[in-house]
Regions:
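An N-terminal assembly and electron-transfer interface module characteristic of large anaerobic redox
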Residues: 1, 5-214
Length: 214
């Protein structure tokens, strides 16, 4: 949860103080805060406190039968091989092909620009696809890896859920692929068959990438 969620509908400013001695940027932020407060007072806007908690939607066995699982494109050669690997295990798995500037712009609308660039790409691809009208929003799910480490990649799943909530699509399940049991879903299981096929896809992806970029 970011500051924007904690202080939702309240005016706040975030000051970043590092090793430099020039506080010009901090002064500008404070002036902007004061200006925003004055504007709000003139408009007599009423504050409404909103809850910031998100309820996780479980991906069930029933959903597995007819739901399309969307996966953001994060490595073109590898993921083109992973898609058939997941499909062969009974998942209607689709790797998105919209990794372009437009999806990044969409990502900027739903993710704080202080987040890392890959998170903008990932969330942007997903939201661009869901907003395109191509998919039945009540028969679609999203999948994302969750490392469990200190990198923000662990929090991509939270970014996605927050974006879905902002777009009024909080009912769409977001499935976590992780090896640490962080989240589990009855309709999505990393069994030996799937892991073996995914491993082969990753290995051949490395081989093909080495040949292409040699």
């Amino acid at each position: 949860v970011g500051l924007g969620d904690v202080y939702k509908r309240q005016i706040y400013t975030c000051l970043k103080i590092d090793e430099v001695n020039n506080l010009g940027a901090a002064r500008i932020r404070v002036r902007s805060l004061l200006s925003a407060i004055r504007v709000r007072e003139k408009k007599h806007q009423e504050r409404k406190i909103m809850p910031t908690n998100l309820n996780r939607v479980i991906f069930t066995e029933e959903m597995r039968k007819d739901y399309t699982i969307l996966c953001p494109q994060m490595s073109p050669i590898h993921f083109d091989l992973l898609e058939p690997a997941f499909r062969s295990c009974g998942y209607n798995f689709e790797v998105l092909d919209n990794d372009n500037r437009h999806s990044v712009d969409i990502g900027l609308k739903y993710v704080n620009n202080d987040a890392c660039y890959p998170s903008l790409c990932v969330v942007g691809q997903i939201m661009d696809a869901l907003l395109s009208g191509k998919y039945d929003l009540h028969k679609v799910a999203v999948v994302i890896t969750q490392t469990g480490g200190g990198c923000r990649a662990t929090n991509y799943i939270g970014f996605i859920r927050r974006a879905l909530e902002k777009a009024g699509m909080e009912y769409i399940p977001v499935v976590s692929i992780n090896m640490g049991g962080i989240e589990t879903n009855p309709g999505f299981k990393l069994d030996a068959n799937l892991l073996t096929r995914a491993a082969f896809g990753a290995i051949f992806g490395d081989i093909f990438m080495r040949c292409v970029y040699h």
